[in-house]
Amino acid sequence: MTTTNAVKTKNIGYITQIIGPVMDVKFSPGKMPNIYNALIVNGKNEAGDEISVTCEVQQLLGDNKVRAISMSGTDGLMRGMEVLDTGAPLSVPVGEATLGRIFNVLGEPVDNLGPVANKSTLPIHRDPPAFTELDTKLSIFETGIKVVDLLAPYRRGGKIGLFGGAGVGKTVLIMELINNIAKAHGGVSVFGGVGERTREGNDLYQEMKESKVINEENLSESKVALVYGQMNEPPGARMRVGLTALTMAEYFRDVNNQDVLLFIDNIFRFVQAGSEVSALLGRMPSAVGYQPTLSREMGTLQERITSTKKGSITSIQAVYVPADDLTDPAPATTFAHLDATTVLSRGLAAKGIYPAVDPLDSTSTMLQPWIVGEEHYDTAQRVKQTLQRYKELQDIIAILGLDELSEEDRLTVARARKIERFLSQPFFVAEVFTGSPGKYVSLADTIKGFLMILSGELDSLPEQAFYLVGDIGEAIAKAEKLKDK
């Protein structure tokens, strides 16, 4: 969807060259479009079928020519075809009408549910908020998920990296966060699927409908808007789909004054698409073949994700690490922007501990005593120390057994196993599958529960009482039930 200032005067050029998704277009002298302007190619292919392709101007070449990158396939395009300069960047629909819908990079709905009702649109290329508008207070974004809030808390308006392989619960964690921000913060979420599998996008949509994150009967009650630019799309679409999702999120923050969660899956694919476009435009590659503009492209996206005095955008970004090499320029550039990392562990998932967030690998810059308070900080450190000691003792236990440990170490192991189980939690969005009602646990209740375990007050309770419960009161009640049995 594009806004049209220049359409009245019909600034029309024609295609002079097509190389894959890149095309050169010649305009009349003095009628050159600006960088980032959207161009539309309308015409018919040789079979007589209508073609409509949107491109974005990337370079001004001289001799009245521009080089543009296509946002969809260029099949059927020919030299000499007319190209219309819209006179403005790509613009996409924003507002409540986007909730419950799936869009492509152009802001066109692709869910077969008809056109979008509202008429508000915004350009995808926008400046980040001015310094004077930023909210500089360091505040925690409470998620209601114990392991996250206690050990790797999210910053309101911050950026979080989500690391994890296939099948360890990334999608369920994402859906729970979408659900909790709607219930606890009255906020909405925008999901940007950047260069990932179409099947995964479809699975996510179906799961969101099942768990009522998307309400089919009344779309306005949905909690999320979806924007997809999957891996079968041309690099131009994959490079810009993150900006489309971000623009929709900015509207909820700046106009509706809401707290917004922005999910980007996967931020590595955004860099990868930029690398492909850079090569197609003939730029000299930088380290490891990446684009020379890598840091600027990443900064342009990340600097728009922030808290203002009106609302906040908190972003959770899945990070693929190529060949597990953390020094690769793509993940290394991403790390510079992150406030916290949530690492999902296959070992914990195998034990049935969900969410399978690794308590020792996950980190946050917010876990400082002057930000979260002394009690929270001390509790988190003691929990980590206990779990770390348990990890060190596991080899000894495997070889010699528990009986060979000292009394103190046996107590540490018993408490660590309770802590490990108490870090699990039933999710609202998993109710359909587990039959257990979901639980939102406040930060105060989380700290209180872990302090009680660490102090030894609950040493007499069986460890299974702590598995998949909400607050500590539930664990005590569960222990009573187990005793009665």
Swiss-Prot record:
As for membrane topology, the entry says:
Peripheral membrane protein
Which SUPFAM superfamilies does the annotation name?
A: C-terminal domain of alpha and beta subunits of F1 ATP synthase, N-terminal domain of alpha and beta subunits of F1 ATP synthase, P-loop containing nucleoside triphosphate hydrolases
- State the InterPro entries in the record: AAA+_ATPase, ATP-synt_VA_C, ATP_synth_F1_bsu, ATPase_a/bsu_AS, ATPase_alpha/beta_chains, ATPase_F1/V1/A1_a/bsu_N, ATPase_F1/V1/A1_a/bsu_N_sf, ATPase_F1/V1/A1_a/bsu_nucl-bd
Q: Where found? A: Plastid, Chloroplast thylakoid membrane
Q: What does the record give as the reaction this protein catalyses?
A: ATP + H2O + 4 H(+)(in) = ADP + phosphate + 5 H(+)(out)
On whether Ion transport is a keyword of this UniProt record, the answer is: yes
From the UniProt record, report the name of the gene that encodes this protein. atpB
Role this protein plays: Produces ATP from ADP in the presence of a proton gradient across the membrane. The catalytic sites are hosted primarily by the beta subunits.
- Which residues of this UniProt protein bind ATP? 164-171
GO BP field: proton motive force-driven mitochondrial ATP synthesis
Q: Which NCBIfam families match?
A: atpD
Is Translocase one of the keywords UniProt gives this record? yes
The record's listing under SMART domains reads: AAA (SM00382)
**Protein name, please?**
ATP synthase subunit beta, chloroplastic
Annotated GO molecular function terms are: ATP binding; ATP hydrolysis activity; proton-transporting ATP synthase activity, rotational mechanism
Keywords of this entry: ATP synthesis, ATP-binding, CF(1), Chloroplast, Hydrogen ion transport, Ion transport, Membrane, Nucleotide-binding, Plastid, Thylakoid, Translocase, Transport
Enzyme's top EC category: translocase
